[in-house]
Amino acid sequence: MPLIEDELEQQDSQLESLQQALNVLMPIRRQRLSRAQRQQRQHQTRLAEAQAQQQAEEEQLVQDQQHYQLQRERLQQQQSSREKLTRHVNNALSALQAVGQQQQQCQQAEQSCHQAAYALEQATEWTREQQKAVEKLEYLSEHLEDA
């Protein structure tokens, strides 16, 4: 009988040690999960902002292209004085430069969207990993209490 009691005491001691370890690990894992979720939300916000910026840049590009087209048409229609022609050429060149700059801004906004999407993807993966770690500890903790 003493052997069985010793084994039970040893088993209880091991279970208690395991429970203590789980009690230490659980808050750490929950904190990591919370941090991962917060970071994921931040990246989602950044992605939404980058997408909105890209949309605004694309809309501005359309406006600049329309303005350039208008200036170009005016230039073609105007063939009066040299002064008017020079002014229209300068206006058309300015409009063309604005289109080029807007295209660059659209490309930068698109790149920002890609970067934000990648960061969100990484944050989401980290969140999943932290969630799995917490679930494993919860599972162990529940089964430890049943034992």
Regions found by a protein language model. Name each.
Residues 1-147:
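Charge-rich amphipathic alpha-helical interaction elements
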